[in-house]
């Protein structure tokens, strides 16, 4: 069960990593006509990493991996939903929301492999056997599936909204509005899958994890 939860959440994460990265530039080019702002977002991610690396382990030690992840995902969900429910005309306000939403996904990326390790140890704790190779293969397969779905979905999405590729092409108003929706709905779908995977399916909270490792150590 924990591995299934991690795999579902990872599907969502790969939608964000692959899908959002694939289409993010379109919204700044076609909707805001401010591709220069993308460099600001890239620079803003550096201090996020600098802050998260020392902070996340402390949060995990106090609250556990699942609780820390859930807080990060909920935070990312809030900032991701805002551009969907209300149209953000100001490129700087939009960029701030993107950066704030990225914080939760950064935490997810930092912790997800630790959850995979917990899944391997859970198998030994629950069933008295380890299947590291099989479980790692399943998890890696879920990442590949997520990337494939993201790439294919983005291609179909762009075609559906009437986007026409080309450096000198002027997009229709419908295509521009479609780009805005497509770019912003991907993080929302990501967060939903992560909430389901980590919040509803993954069943190793701090107390259970500590008990699991205590019993494994005693063997």
PLM regions and their residue ranges:
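Membrane-embedded alpha-helical bundles of multi-pass transporters/translocases
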Residues: 1-218
């Amino acid at each position: 069960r924990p591995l299934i939860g991690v795999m579902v959440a990872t599907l969502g994460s790969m939608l964000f990593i692959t899908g959002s990265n694939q289409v993010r530039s379109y919204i700044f080019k076609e909707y805001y006509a401010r591709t220069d702002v993308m460099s600001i977002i890239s620079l803003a991610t550096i201090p996020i990493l600098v802050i998260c690396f020392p902070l996340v382990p402390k949060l995990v030690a106090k609250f556990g991996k699942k609780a820390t992840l859930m807080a990060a995902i909920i935070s990312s969900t809030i900032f991701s939903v805002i551009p969907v429910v209300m149209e953000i005309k100001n490129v700087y306000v939009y960029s701030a929301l993107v950066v704030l939403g990225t914080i939760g996904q950064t935490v997810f990326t930092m912790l997800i492999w630790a959850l995979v390790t917990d899944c391997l140890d859970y198998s030994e704790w629950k069933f008295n056997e380890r299947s590291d190779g099989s479980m790692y293969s399943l998890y890696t397969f879920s990442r590949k599936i997520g990337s494939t779905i993201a790439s294919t979905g983005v291609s179909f999405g762009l075609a559906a909204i009437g986007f026409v590729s080309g450096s000198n092409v002027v997009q229709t108003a419908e295509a521009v509005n479609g780009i805005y929706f497509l770019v912003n709905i991907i993080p929302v779908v990501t967060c939903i899958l992560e909430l389901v995977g980590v919040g509803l399916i993954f069943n190793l909270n701090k107390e259970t994890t500590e008990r699991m490792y205590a019993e494994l150590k005693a063997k």
